[in-house]
Amino acid sequence: MSKQTIFIDVILPLSLPNLFTYRLPEELNNDIQIGQRAVVPFGRGGKLYSALVKNIHHSPPTEYEAKYVDSLLDDKPIVNQKQLKHWDWIVDYYIANPGDVFNAALPGALKL
């Protein structure tokens, strides 16, 4: 039986207007949940960031090749669906970037 590749959309703690898609290593397929933090490489240098999982799906990005998630930081979500919905409202109402809301909502100790 072949396993499907899982991709996740994450909010990076940077002032960027978009979510970014990462490929989940097969060994983490059963552990991933929306609202968990994942360690992901970003940029040409591959600097590691603590990003928040917003969506889980099976569709690879079309504009770039998805990098692999390095690891998961949490066993359980640290942000629930209701909070993420509120963050979406803040992004829309204040025309803010998701990363800015992420930075404002979570304490610095929860970031890399």
Predicted feature locations:
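Accessory, non-ATPase domains that flank or precede helicase/AAA+ motor cores in DNA-metabolism machines
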Residues: 1-112
